[in-house]
């Protein structure tokens, strides 16, 4: 029949293994990591670029399929440890001036590696602004259609 069905028109939905799931990050199935600490050479100011700085990263990764919820099979989901490893590798290997650019780069890498429909990331950089505990950026990246 027609896709999407009339009852779902205007909603962000897609088919995954015969199950209709939402692709809206607020409601779709995802895995997440909170407080992943990585080291990265990042910053605009010269004093920030002499040594790697600690960053705290929260990331949510949209699942390309809901199969794992029924199968209990590790192969049907996204591996938390693999996501953490990818973030650590990219944070160490790349040099960015802006947290915004780093957020985009990490999201793109995660979407590409894990076929995720979307990634939401927050990167926190402590102790940069006097009087503020930390600064940071949050970013939502959707995989290109197609």
Task: Show where each model-derived region lies.
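N-terminal, polar/charged subdomain of small-to-medium soluble alpha/beta proteins
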Residues: 20-146
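Intrinsic disorder/low-complexity segments
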Residues: 16-18
């Amino acid at each position: 029949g027609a896709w999407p069905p009339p009852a779902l028109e205007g909603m962000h939905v897609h088919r995954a293994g015969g199950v209709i799931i939402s692709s809206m990050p607020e409601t779709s199935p995802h895995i997440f990591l909170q407080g992943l600490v990585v080291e990265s050479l990042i910053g605009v100011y010269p004093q920030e670029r002499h040594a790697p700085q600690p960053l705290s990263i929260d990331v949510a990764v949209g699942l390309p399929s809901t199969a794992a919820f029924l199968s209990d099979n590790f192969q049907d989901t996204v591996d938390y440890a693999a996501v953490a490893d990818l973030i650590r590798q990219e944070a160490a290997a790349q040099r960015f001036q802006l947290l915004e650019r780093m957020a985009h780069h990490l999201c793109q890498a995660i979407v590409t590696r894990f076929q995720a429909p979307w990634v939401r990331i927050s990167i926190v950089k402590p102790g940069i602004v006097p009087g503020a505990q930390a600064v940071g950026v949050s970013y939502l990246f959707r995989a290109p259609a197609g």
